[in-house]
Design a protein with these regions (language model features):
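Terminal-region recognition feature
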Residues: 1-168
Length: 168
């Protein structure tokens, strides 16, 4: 569904909603999201934390995927319904999970290595990939992991001596 993914415009929405709020009362945040852009997600988390510190409660009535899950992790608690879902933290590029792109590239490499004739099948597919795209995927995966861990360490696990190991 176009326009439903987390993007840079969403931070403006949060800023509009939070305008003149009493931040000392905390935030009850309802999330229903398929996920979205990693940079936008990180920016939203940082903005929420700057305004409400660790006084954020998150409610997931149905689903919160990828970037939505990372935002949910910034709360000190998450409440969900019996049929609600938190999705994996899997950054997307053009609605394709970065890890899936890397796995497909590895599959192509392995297949062509074991049978060079398969190159004729894979080359048209691989030629569509920009030279830096695989590195972008790797960096997005690592960045997403760091965002999730930081959110947990400074949120739900704040003050826990085992926060880092639990977040990993």
């Amino acid at each position: 569904m176009p326009g439903a993914y987390i993007n840079d415009e969403d931070k403006n929405g949060f800023m509009s909603c939070f305008y003149q709020m009493d931040f000392s009362k905390g935030l009850d945040l309802f999330i229903h999201s398929p996920g979205g852009d990693v940079a936008a997600t990180d920016s939203i988390i940082n903005y929420i934390r700057a305004k409400f510190k660790d006084d954020v409660r998150v409610f997931v009535p149905q689903l919160s995927m990828s970037g939505g899950t990372m935002i949910a992790l910034c709360g000190k608690e998450i409440s969900m319904g019996s049929h609600s879902n938190l999705g994996p933290i899997d950054p997307q590029f053009g609605h394709f999970p970065a890890q899936l792109v890397l796995s497909e590239f590895d599959r192509a490499y392995q297949e062509m290595k074991s049978d060079p004739q398969k190159a004729s099948v894979w080359m048209p597919i691989l030629s569509q990939i920009q030279p830096t795209f695989l590195t972008q995927c790797e960096r997005a995966i690592e960045w997403s992991k760091q965002i999730g861990e930081k959110a947990l360490i400074t949120g739900m696990f704040a003050g826990d001596p085992d926060a880092t190991s639990k977040a990993e």
